[in-house]
Regions:
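Glycine/proline-enriched, intrinsically flexible loops and inter-domain linkers
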Residues: 1-848
Length: 848
């Protein structure tokens, strides 16, 4: 605050605009790190939040003590390692950046059957190999598994780009800032893919504790405050970037009190060719200039990747949360597209996790060396140490390789768009990463160090099947009041309306929206998938959807992943997606899998869960023909939360997979939505219902987990999906909806609420694997099912196309606004559509 003297007061100026200014009374300096013993280096790692693994520490020491290395370092006036070098190595070796867990060696043991298997790299065996195998069969797959995002063919003139990421740790610390930088950060991945793409879409998924949690634990942020901040952060990041946000998910569970999950996904589009070169190819060459464009570097975002590679606790550094500025990034986005189109960009990547350390360090591998002048890096304020400049994750920055002859034009375009661009170094083929500060070398590390000399992480994985863990099917008699039961389930937090979130996000910007996030007569029911037209002159579009169901992990993570993939596929098929063009993005969030008898006594079981999840990923991507265009693993979704007596309790999040599926649609005018359309239309159930209520919404309501988790028979289901896709393409389907969480009863209510029409529905006609009681038919969550409405005039043609599939006409749409469900001639449920919708909307209402 400030006191103004009367003589100094100017009524025209008033108090003015006080602008915060950071002033650091600190002279930048490089610190030499003593490495006399492994224990000493381990203490330094803990003190500096480096998250170095014990097995990595001897390798680092041995490297810096080698005679040949010492001799070379003396030529640049270095001896012992510097803090800059140690920070660089720890960033590059972090699980967040190097995916050490997924590249690790797992010794799997099934304690029930005695089966033993050694899995050498989950990434290689379950992600890379299946994707490369499918890439040979799918000519639309352009680029996978090496760049910032995957690339697929949209048409002969354009490629689409897709990727996904999480921003869990920073969002858990500071919800708004963490989520905002999460969404603008994922936007930079398509911008840094190939020679750069235009952003066309963003998506979100949040997993948090119960919004109205009132238990005895005290998480760092209450779930309500956390969720509000996350929603606002993604809103500001997306809306202010001019990128539509047409799809999202939200899930509540107490296991996320320790650490929330914030998934963000982005898509872009780029011309297939830039001049005579394919747009997805890029390389750095000796002599290319290293240019940093966009924002400046500050102390925000330091140790982001290492904080994300550990359990969240009271010791997690607050400084790892970045500060985002979407307007700066929007200007940079437009500038870089213009520079790309003029052929000025040889290579581009974003400064995300690890900052310059990651962006320059990884891009220099192509040329096999680089030199960076850290004193040339633009700073938000003076006083940053050299290591802070190098690893800071300050936002809105890209690294571009520019030929010297293109520099003047590149800088001219940068000034035109009011974007700051600075030459900070040069790529070379020296075999070294060299960092200088005011003419003095502060880092000198061989390029091959990180590739060749560190040991593979190893894990013991012990699987105990669910029955041996004490899980069993509960004994529940048939409910007497099905109407009240359905209304109760519709009002549950993981089923009810989330319109208050979707309506905050701009999905119409850029003008390409085809199927919106909310559909139906009142535009208030969530759609199965989003469909956009990225090229407005064409009818061609992209359908994209996501699925998330971690509750099945309580029984078996293999089935959880299978069901999640199947649901995402069905959602895309239901709007008109092409079953021959399904691209996937896998985003794993997993609790720590490293066994520790005190800190993580169930680590071996969690490791086995991860192995089984990846086996399912491999099996079902191959079965459905889904190459994994991109993906991300975010481990350590554990947190230590304060209890009522001051104790700290560890909470591990449910093993979680967010699976994204995208598909190219030839003609978006043939797309369908989930809302029922016309009285008199026939209602079909496509797919069989089994006794599969394990970990279902119904069992949760009854206080049980159960045992019979939904299973997926891909060989049986995929031909059905192909036939349904053909029926939609031939315009025989009026509406189509994938049945998901909650089962048949919930999704009958949703399609009726969307279309504001009644449904007369007979449970006796539903295709069943075996005889089931009414509540099991209504609330089983069997995979592979759809609700489809068809005009009577199209009945014959539809059934001919679907021949050989488990389908049945089970009801009819009526003008009377009732959901009327009968079995054996008796009505067991009759509720007005308005009342059902009232219960569905009641929990959160209109919170905007």
């Amino acid at each position: 605050w400030k006191i103004f003297e009367k003589y100094s007061w100017d009524s025209k100026i008033g108090i003015g605009y006080p602008i915060p200014k950071v002033v650091l009374q600190h002279e930048p300096q490089v610190t030499v790190i003593p490495i006399s013993s492994d224990e000493e280096l381990k203490r330094i790692s803990q003190k500096r939040n480096l998250a170095l693994r014990d097995s990595d520490i001897p390798v680092i020491r041995q490297y810096f003590l080698r005679e040949d290395v010492l001799r070379e370092r003396k030529e640049v006036e270095l001896d012992l390692p510097t803090d800059v070098e140690l920070e660089y190595i720890s960033q590059a070796r972090s699980d967040h950046c190097n995916h050490n867990t997924f590249r690790g060696l797992f010794r799997y043991h099934n304690l029930s059957t005695g089966q033993k298997e050694v899995v050498d790299s989950l990434f290689k065996t379950c992600i890379e190999e299946p994707t490369l195998e499918l890439m040979k069969k799918k000519d639309w797959v352009i680029s996978v598994l090496w760049d910032n995002a995957g690339v697929g063919r949209f048409d002969e003139d354009n490629y689409y780009v897709i990727t996904g990421e999480t921003h869990n740790s920073p969002s858990n610390m500071e919800a708004y800032g963490g989520a905002l930088t999460g969404i603008v950060g994922i936007y930079r991945d398509p911008m840094g893919t190939g020679k750069g793409s235009k952003l066309i879409l963003g998506m979100y998924a949040y997993c948090v504790g119960p919004r109205d949690y009132s238990g005895e634990l005290s998480p760092h942020l209450h779930p309500r405050r956390l969720l509000d901040g996350v929603i606002e952060g993604v809103r500001d990041g997306g809306n202010k970037s001019g990128v539509p946000t047409p799809y999202g998910l939200l899930l509540f569970d107490e296991s996320y009190l320790g650490k929330c999950l914030v998934f963000v996904t982005a898509m872009g589009i780029m011309p297939a060719k830039i001049g005579a070169e394919s747009s997805h190819k890029k390389v750095t060459s000796p002599g290319d200039l290293i240019v940093m464009s966009g924002g400046r570097v500050g102390k925000d975002g330091i140790h982001g990747v290492t904080a994300a590679s550990e359990t969240y606790s009271e010791h997690t550094p607050a400084g790892h949360v970045q500060i985002g500025d979407p307007y700066t990034q929007k200007k940079m986005h437009d500038f870089l597209l213009e520079a790309r189109d003029e052929g000025l960009i040889s290579f581009i990547t974003d400064c995300g996790g690890g900052g310059l350390s990651s962006a320059v360090g990884e891009s220099a591998r192509f040329s096999n060396g680089c030199r960076v002048d850290l004193d040339k890096v633009p700073l938000k304020y003076e006083g940053l140490d050299q290591w802070e400049i190098w690893v800071s994750e300050s936002q809105e920055r890209m690294i571009i390789a520019v030929k010297p002859e293109h520099l003047d034009r590149f800088m001219e375009l940068s000034r035109k768009h009011a974007v700051e661009s600075t030459v900070i170094g040069e790529y070379n083929d020296s075999g070294y990463l060299r960092l200088d500060y005011k003419g003095k070398t502060c880092a000198y590390v061989r390029m091959d160090l990180l590739k060749s000399e560190f040991p593979q992480w190893e894990f013991d994985a012990e699987w105990t099947p669910p029955r041996l863990r004490g899980l069993a099917e509960p004994v529940i008699a048939e409910p007497e009041d099905h109407g009240s039961l359905l209304k109760d389930i519709l009002a549950r937090p993981n089923i009810c309306s989330r319109n208050w979130i979707a309506r905050q996000y701009d999905h119409e910007v850029q003008g390409g929206s085809v199927i919106k996030p909310l559909v139906g007569r009142q535009r208030d029911i969530p759609s199965d998938a989003a469909v956009i037209r990225p090229v407005l002159e064409k009818k061609k579009g992209i359908a994209v959807s996501q699925a998330l169901n971690p509750f099945y992990s309580q029984i078996d993570t293999y089935d959880m992943v299978a069901a999640t993939i199947d649901e995402a596929v069905r959602k895309v098929i239901s709007v008109g997606g092409d079953p021959e063009h399904l691209g996937g993005v896998d985003n794993f969030c997993w609790p720590s899998v490293e066994y520790d008898p005190v800190e993580n006594p169930d680590g071996k079981y969690k490791a086995a869960q991860l192995v089984r999840a990846n086996w399912a990923l491999r099996d079902y991507c191959l079965a459905y023909g889904i190459p994994l265009l991109s993906g991300k693993d975010s481990m350590y979704i554990d947190g230590k939360v304060r209890g009522p007596y001051g104790e700290r309790r560890k909470i591990s999040g449910l093993p979680t997979l967010l699976f994204t599926v995208c598909s190219v649609i030839e003609d978006v005018t043939k797309c369908v939505t989930m809302d029922v359309k016309f009285p008199g239309d026939l209602v079909y159930v496509v797919g069989e219902t089994s006794d599969e209520l394990g970990a279902s919404e119904f069992y949760q309501r009854m206080g049980h987990i159960g045992l019979n988790v939904p299973k997926v028979d891909a060989k049986k289901l995929f031909p059905v999906y192909a036939r349904l896709a053909r029926a939609i393409d031939e315009e025989l389907v009026a509406s189509c909806h994938a049945i998901g969480r909650g089962g048949l009863g919930v999704h009958l209510a949703l399609i009726a609420m969307a279309g504001e029409l009644g449904i007369d529905f007979s449970l006796d006609e539903v295709p069943l694997v075996s005889q089931l009681s009414p509540y099991r038919v209504l609330y089983s969550e069997s995979c592979g099912r759809f609700l489809v409405t068809v005009s009577p005039k199209n009945k014959k043609a539809f059934e001919q196309i679907m021949a050989g599939s488990p389908i049945a006409p089970v009801g009819k749409l009526t003008e009377d606004p009732f959901l009327n469900i009968t079995t054996k001639g008796h009505t067991i449920l009759k509720e007005t559509i308005d009342e059902l919708k009232g219960y569905w909307k009641r929990p959160f209402g209109d919170l905007i």
